[in-house]
């Protein structure tokens, strides 16, 4: 393939994230810092997980259960880290609100909190794309492409970029769901995020079957779509509640 193809694969994986960054995140410095810190945090977590599993590699390609165990342990570790990330954010939010009270300035608005959660999720998604897609794209800039036997209809680099895009979407918007679930004590949202994460991870194992990507990738995008819809409904409801409370207090 050519340089254009390599850039195209990268844009498939991260193009929507770049658009979101330029249109929303780049306007506020604290959101940029949130994205950068979140990306670094999740990259470090993936490196730690890689180190923990290094003694057990290579895994046998014809046995699926070690990969399932890998997915389960990775999801559990990252979900625990997500909760710690929210705890740190909550402490910073309390500090900022206290400082705003001292200088007689308004506290963080609901939209600010939602955007911080969005930025944190975007950092998680970008870290996933960098680790699992962009790190593989160097050969894509060369004169040829690469196919794998179990997904012979689509180039390996393209399918990697498509899967990365799905995970970027899932991680970005599930972070918003999780932060609101933690803040409101909503057990449903607190549970649904790990379930979404685990389901998406398990669906990647379908690719081990012959032409499994034909089934696994659409199912992965179904999960991403449901995550996006649920997040949209939740945010809309929270904005309506906030507006009603503001109207009632006047």
Curated annotation (Swiss-Prot):
Function: Probable subunit of the gamma-secretase complex, an endoprotease complex that catalyzes the intramembrane cleavage of integral proteins such as Notch receptors.
Family: Belongs to the APH-1 family.
Residue spans crossing the bilayer: 5-25, 29-49, 57-77, 116-136, 157-177, 191-211, 212-232
Chief location of this protein within or outside the cell: membrane
Record's bilayer topology term: Multi-pass membrane protein
Subunit description: Probable component of the gamma-secretase complex, a complex composed of a presenilin homodimer, nicastrin, APH1 and PEN2.
Assigned keywords, A-Z: Membrane, Notch signaling pathway, Transmembrane, Transmembrane helix
An individual GO BP term: Notch signaling pathway
Name of this protein: Gamma-secretase subunit APH1-like
Subcellular location: Membrane
Signal peptide: none
InterPro entries: Aph-1
GO cellular component: membrane
């Amino acid at each position: 393939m050519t340089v254009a193809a390599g850039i195209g694969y990268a844009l498939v994986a991260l193009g929507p994230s770049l658009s979101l960054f330029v249109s929303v995140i780049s306007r506020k410095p604290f959101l940029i810092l949130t994205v950068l810190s979140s990306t670094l945090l999740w990259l470090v977590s993936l490196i730690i997980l890689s180190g923990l599993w290094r003694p057990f590699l290579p895994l046998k390609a014809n046995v699926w259960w070690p990969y399932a165990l890998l997915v389960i342990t990775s999801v559990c570790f990252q979900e625990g880290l997500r909760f710690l990330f929210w705890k740190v954010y909550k402490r910073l939010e309390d500090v900022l609100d206290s400082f705003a009270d001292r200088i007689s300035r308004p506290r963080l608005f609901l939209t600010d909190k939602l955007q911080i959660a969005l930025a944190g999720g975007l950092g998680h998604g970008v870290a996933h794309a960098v680790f699992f897609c962009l790190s593989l794209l160097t050969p894509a800039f060369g004169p040829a492409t690469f196919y794998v036997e179990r997904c012979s209809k689509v180039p390996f680099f393209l399918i990697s970029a498509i899967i990365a895009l799905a995970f970027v979407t899932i991680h970005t918007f599930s972070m918003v769901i999780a932060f609101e679930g933690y803040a409101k004590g909503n057990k449903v949202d607190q549970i649904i995020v790990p379930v979404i994460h685990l389901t998406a991870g398990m669906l990647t194992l379908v690719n081990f079957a012959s032409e499994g990507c034909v089934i696994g990738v659409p199912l992965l995008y179904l999960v991403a779509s449901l995550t996006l819809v649920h997040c949209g409904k939740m945010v809309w409801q929270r904005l309506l509640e906030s507006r009603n409370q503001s109207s009632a207090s006047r």
